[in-house]
Design a protein with these regions (language model features):
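Short beta-strand scaffold segments in enzyme catalytic cores
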Residues: 15-20, 137-139, 145-149
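Short Gly/Thr/Asp-enriched flexible loops that form oxyanion-binding sites at enzyme active sites
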Residues: 78-102, 121-122
């Protein structure tokens, strides 16, 4: 028997809904929030308001693209955390209301586990390779950087994690002081592919075990950038950055 699930995600600044039938992704609709760009980061209050505006059309579109009506949904899965409290409440409240009004069971999901288990989804036109249990997963998502041992869909153990900043946070902070548009991570990734990996020397973190540390690397980058700009005020223009910089933050 095929089971059709409506998934609702609102943990940060993207409102998303998907319809899955027997591990096959039928639709996946995402509404991003451009309102945060001028602030260089996610503003929680603005994020929750945008979720309220987006969640109904996003869910409606996901159902239509999947060719499924709400009465054919067997369960509603929603993100219970981790994430921004206000954003999470929008998704949780909507999922509960939909569940009560249509008498559909609810399934709460840890969104980090959802990232890991997305490896087991298939597309309508092809089946993707699935990992065999047990396996190790490097999970890099927003405010989280972890190594997770996965023994089964419901049996996971974190064996390594960041002891300070997550990788994504370090990317975002470095992008912000360079004046890169939000989100800065993808821009840094693109610029890195065009650059010389040996051009600058940055601190290498030393952490025991399988844990990570990015705060020292971030600080090393900020000092390097400050010194480079002091030597050459046009330094940032050399790496193809045209946006106004915020170097006062690191002076």
């Amino acid at each position: 028997m095929d089971i059709t699930i409506l998934g609702i995600e609102s943990s940060c600044d993207d409102t998303s809904a998907a319809v899955i039938r027997d591990r096959t992704l039928l639709s996946n609709v995402i509404a991003s929030q451009a309102v945060h760009q001028k602030y260089g980061g996610v503003i929680p209050e603005l994020a929750s308001r945008a979720h309220q505006q987006n969640i109904v059309p996003v869910v409606d579109t996901a159902l239509k693209e999947a060719g499924v009506t709400i009465d054919k949904i067997d369960a509603i899965a929603f993100t219970r955390g981790p994430g921004l409290l206000g954003s999470l409440l929008v998704g949780v409240s909507f999922a509960k209301g939909l569940s009560i009004s249509h008498d559909i069971p609810l399934v709460e999901v840890n969104h980090l586990q959802g990232h890991i288990l997305s490896h087991f989804l298939d597309l309508p036109d092809r089946q993707l390779p699935h990992p065999d249990f047990p396996f190790l997963c490097l999970l890099v998502s927003g405010g989280h950087t972890q190594i997770v041992r996965v023994d089964s869909p419901l049996d996971m153990e974190i064996i390594g994690t960041t002891i300070d900043d997550a990788a994504g946070e370090a990317f975002d902070k470095c992008a912000k002081v360079m004046g890169l548009p939000y989100p800065g991570g993808p821009v840094i990734d693109r610029l890195a592919k065009e650059g010389n990996p040996k051009a600058f020397r940055l601190a290498h973190p030393h952490v025991d075990g399988y844990d990570y540390s990015f705060s020292g690397l971030k600080t090393s980058f900020l000092y390097m950038l400050r010194d480079a700009v002091a030597d050459d005020p046009d330094f940032l223009s050399l790496i193809h950055i045209s946006e106004p910089t915020r170097l006062g933050m690191i002076s």
